[in-house]
Amino acid sequence: MNILIVSQYFYPENFRINDFAQEFQSREHKVTILTGTPNYPGGDYYEGYGAFKKNRESYEGIEIFRSPLIPRGSGSSVRLALNYISFIFGSIFTSFFLLNKKFDIIFVFEPSPITVCLPAIFIKKIKNIPICFWVLDLWPESVVSAGNLKTGIIPKILNPLVKFIYTNSDKILVSSRGFINSIVEKGINKNKVDFFPQWAEPIFKPVKPDKNNLDFIPQNSFKIMFAGNIGEAQDFSSIIEAAIILKAKKNIHWVILGGGRKEDWVKAEIKKNKLENCFHIMGSYPLEEMPEFYAQADCMLFSLKKEYIFSITIPAKVQTYLACAKPIVAMIDGEAAKLIDDAQAGLSCPSESPELLAENITRLSTLGKNELDKLGQNALNYYNNEFERTMLMDRMESIFNKMTD
C-alpha cells in the first residue's frame, strides 16, 4: 500500500507520527511524508534546515517532502496563526511535486491545528484518493477554550471551516470517545467516526533504573512526578496550592520534568511559598530517558483545568504512565478520570481541586510497596488491553485496507 502522511510535524521533531510512519514502513508499505520545516518546540528552524533548505530528504527509508513555513517563534497568537497558515499554503505548493506519485490513501495526523487537513483535501480532490483523519485535538473547541473566545468572530470563522474538513474526510478517528458527539453534532455521519486512542512509544515499559537521578531527595520520601508541558492548561496554580497544603509533610516531594510558558511563574511561586525543599523543577530530558525517570517515582501526576474540552480529552502522557506500570494521581474531569477509575490504577479528583489532590496524595503516600505495585500492575494490564501498540497498528492497517478495497 502507498501511504501519504500529511503532518505539520515530523522527525526530527518528536511526535508519535514518527513511530507510526516507521512501523508502517517496516510492514512493507511505501510511506511518503508531506510535512513542514522542523521548528517545534523551540520556535526556530532546526540546525541545517530553512524555508527553502533541505526540503527533500529520507528518514528510515521514508521519503520526506518538506514545505516552507514561518516558524512558530515565541508561540504568540499572531506567530502561531502565521505558522499554521504558512504551512497550508507551503504544503499546497509542495504537493505539486507529489502529483506524479501513486498513493492509495492519505493519512492526516492532527495534534493541532485542524488546518493540517486542508493540503490533504487539495491532493484528494486532484488524485481522487480517500483521507483518514486522526483527530487528537478537537477544533474549534480547544482553540476557543484556550483563547477564551466563546463568542465573537473566531468561532464564526472556525465552525464552517471545521465542518468542511470533517465533511471531506472519508474516515475520522478520534483519540478520545468524548470527541465523537461533538463531531456528529456538526452534521457529520456517525458511521465514519471511530475511537482510535494513542499508544506509548515502545521505549515506555517497566524498567529498573541504572542510576539514581533523584539522589538529592531523601531515600524514604514519597515522590510525585509530573512529565510534560508546564502550561496554562495543566493548572499548576492548583498543583502549587496542593504542595502548600502538604508542605508540612516533609516526606512528600514533587518532581517536575519538562518546560513551558508557565515555567518561570512556577519557579517564582516555589520561591514565594518557600517550597524549594520539596518542589523540584528538573527541566527537559530526551524522551528515551523518561522510563528511567518514571521508575524512580512513587506515582505519576497529571492535571488539566476545568474546561469542557479538557473533560473530553485523554492526554497522551497517560498512556506512557500506564505502560510503565506506574500508579497515577490525577486532577481531571471526565474521560481521563473515568480511565483512571476503570483501570484501578490510582486516584483522581475533579479539576481545580487542590485540597482533594492533597488528600489523594496523602492516601497514596501511606500505602505500602505491595499496594503501590498492585496499582502499577493494574495500570500495565489496562494499557495492554486497551492501548497496546501492535494491536492498534494492526487495527489501523485493517482500517486502511477497508478504505482502499
Region spans (language model):
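A charged, aromatic-enriched C-terminal amphipathic alpha-helix characteristic of glycosyltransferases
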Residues: 211, 356, 369-401
